[in-house]
């Protein structure tokens, strides 16, 4: 039997065993049974070189993750191997890898899909956005793309101009008159629970590191679930963290963070409240460093509709 057939047979056997185990636990919900079966089916024996990594000190594991991401090694692994590897790593390896950074780029642009629960109501249509940003000084240009909620809107935040305000317009025939509004004003809060300056990989990273300290204090030592998967066209290692008390002590009762396979930042986020309802979903579809001069944050840019 060749390697491919062996792996297929192993996966089938693992799934069957997982299903039998779940049938022996009549109180377990059907959805959890299926999740357990899928998780068991994904686990494989690690190659010797990867197994050795999991026995190294945590600092070495974090350094290896950075090298493996940069060289494309992580992206070359199949989902089952990625899942098993990240389950076997020291629980502090990923936080250290993330903390060591870099968690973004000095100047970059990205497209993202964002969906939130605003004032208790889940948005039926997600925002689809193009974002350009520099970090020093902090400047952000955001455009809401066709097909998403609030399509046609544009906004610019430039900390060298006004630190507490952004300049933007609502788009459409009646919304092309630009105006200055507060970063946390009523108009901004009506569309998002976050400020425009929070757009970017750095905000997600900082939130993860801050929450991580609270996870440890609460006895949450490792993710409750690890799974390599593709979300919205983006392949990630999804790390699920569930907290004992949820909000307001923690940002979310359950958080699912999709780790990029090439850099130490997250590409996807799903956040759930204490009742198990999702209140935030983010997918950073494409991201790349970019050279952005002053015109990228100038409302007079001919490519913009201010």
Name each model-derived stretch.
Residues 2-14:
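Bacterial N-terminal signal peptides that target proteins for export
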Residues 14-24:
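Bacterial N-terminal signal peptides
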Residues 27-113, 117-126, 134-138, 146-149, ...:
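N-terminal leader/targeting segments and the immediate start of mature chains
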Residues 32, 38-75, 128-203, 276-280:
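An acidic-aromatic
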Residues 34, 44, 48, 145-147, ...:
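Gly/Pro-enriched, hydrophobic low-complexity segments
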Residues 104-107, 132-139, 157-165, 259-267, ...:
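Short, solvent-exposed coil/turn segments at beta-strand boundaries
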Residues 120-122, 141, 152, 178, ...:
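Short acidic, gly/pro-rich beta-turn/loop elements at beta-sheet edges
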